[in-house]
Amino acid sequence: MKKWLIMSVGLLLCLASCQQGEKRAISDEQLAEVFTLAKYQYVMLDQQLTDSTMPRTVQADGSLRTSDLNWWCSGFFPGALWYIYEFGHSQNISYMAMKQTQKLLPLLDMNTDHDIGFQLNCSFGNAYKLTGNDLCREVLVEGARKLAARMNPTTGVIRSWDFLRKGWKYPVIIDNMMNLELLMVGAQLSGDVELGLVARTHADTTMKNHFRPDYTSYHLVNYDPETGEVLSRETVQGYADESAWSRGQAWALYGYSMMYRETRDERYLAQARGVADMLLKRLPEDGIPAWDLDDPSADALRDVSAAAIMASAFIELSEHTGEAAYMHMAERQLLTMMTPEYLAKPGENGGFLLKHGVGNLPEKSEVDVPLSYADYYFLEALVRYWKHEV
């Protein structure tokens, strides 16, 4: 295994050096080492799956815990495989990525929440960018139309969940900003401008109702579907309703950076910058946030998933603005995640890359464990960094 890893690092380093020649905070050699590890770990994960399962996290005994294909994270594993393929161009990984992507085709027959954006855009979207596959294109357009059908013109937002609890009538979470990319992709591929309009309307309404004056975001806004009135603002997965749940802030940063890329609407850029500048003031020196920015505990758990999402978004925002501070924070976060404290060794961590993710601490679900979406956005951030022109 050690010989295989050394040979793979050498090949990937050659490919990376052709892509970038200037010295940067994260070297081509470091990038190649991570992607070699990723290839090894993800082959290991692939071997443990069935036709109806995807990696989710690890069990208490360290063994792999899988999910069914309906789980909101099901698109992250195939999407991560496409990033590994994009960096190293392994045909074996390409085959594996397409196999895992096509497992998600049954999702087109379901429309029970907003997560079809995560599920399809991260998998079929990445596949289409790299292969131009016609089936992937068709899936993206159909998926976008299903997502758009969840829009209520009265509320001006896409409903997140169909299940109701705690007095919810029409719950919308900040995570939903991420699903808008599927709408923008679907609009571009189909020429259906209505899909893009739905995305813009949701982004505008979220900007109005989800954020506090300091640019921190609530997790959930509950609307009256008949009047559009805001009934409550909550932070379901955070420390308190008025706290800044870290992954929610990451979704906000990423979502508005993406919407600016897709629309060039300066309002979205201003919103992304507001969130980014707030984070620069509140993140710790190593860039890895506590699971909630307002958890007062000195030993509050860190959430590597929030850091990975932020790093990817900071890189994109730095390219939109030319602001060096955003790139420097992304570099700091990535370098920290590449240390042994956070990055697994070959064969460990159930096959996942990153350790110390926090899923839903209030519900004591997936706490201080690897998470598929942490790996996905970590690899995306590294690919974005690799392709970034210095």
Question: What name fits each language-model region?
Answer:
Residues I6, Q19-G21:
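N-terminal hydrophobic alpha-helix used for membrane targeting or insertion
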Residues L15-S17:
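C-terminal motif of bacterial Sec signal peptides marking the signal peptidase cleavage site
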